[in-house]
């Protein structure tokens, strides 16, 4: 069902060329990052999703982390705002960093799996934009505040 909805969304994007605003969070603990594999698209991603009307970026990232992986997060740092112009849409994503978090037991039905990976051994299926930001963090490189995702 989720794959069918995703296909419908891609058709919608082709026709209407929407602008989207989303959030992602880099959850780091003991040199490892928590990534999720979704049920409707292949790959491993940092948790996140869309910002709802009337919601701040911080509220959105906290809600998405709770919904997807039952995470309660402490202090957040905004790393930057990144853009991606693919699949006939204009994506804008705010990326946060959190090293103070706890995970519960439940997992959203959209999430097939959540797993920690060492920052120096990420799976091949991590999209380029996610991998670039994770590599910058791992290497201690200053992460640009703006750029491509």
PLM regions: where:
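Acidic, metal-coordinating catalytic segment for phosphate/diphosphate chemistry
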Residues: 1-24
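A cytosolic small-molecule/anion-sensing beta-strand core signal
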Residues: 29
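Short loop/turn segments immediately following the C-termini of beta-strands
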Residues: 38
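Short, surface-exposed beta-strand-loop junctions and turns on beta-sheet-rich folds
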Residues: 41-43
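A short gly/proline-enriched turn/hairpin at secondary-structure junctions
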Residues: 45-48
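Unchanged
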Residues: 51-74, 83-137, 145-149
């Amino acid at each position: 069902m989720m794959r069918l909805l995703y296909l419908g969304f891609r058709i919608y994007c082709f026709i209407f060329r929407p602008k989207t605003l989303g959030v992602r969070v880099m959850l780091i603990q003991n040199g490892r990052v928590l990534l999720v594999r979704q049920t409707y698209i292949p790959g491993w991603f940092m948790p996140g999703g869309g910002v709802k009307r009337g919601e701040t970026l911080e509220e959105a990232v906290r809600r998405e982390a709770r919904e997807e992986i039952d995470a309660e997060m402490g202090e957040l740092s905004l790393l930057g705002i990144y853009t991606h112009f693919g699949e006939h849409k204009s994506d804008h994503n705010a990326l946060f960093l959190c090293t103070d978090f706890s995970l519960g037991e439940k997992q959203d039905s959209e999430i097939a799996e959540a797993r920690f990976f060492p920052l120096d051994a990420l799976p091949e299926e991590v999209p380029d934009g996610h991998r670039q930001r994770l590599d910058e963090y791992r290497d201690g490189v200053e992460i640009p505040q703006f750029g491509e995702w």
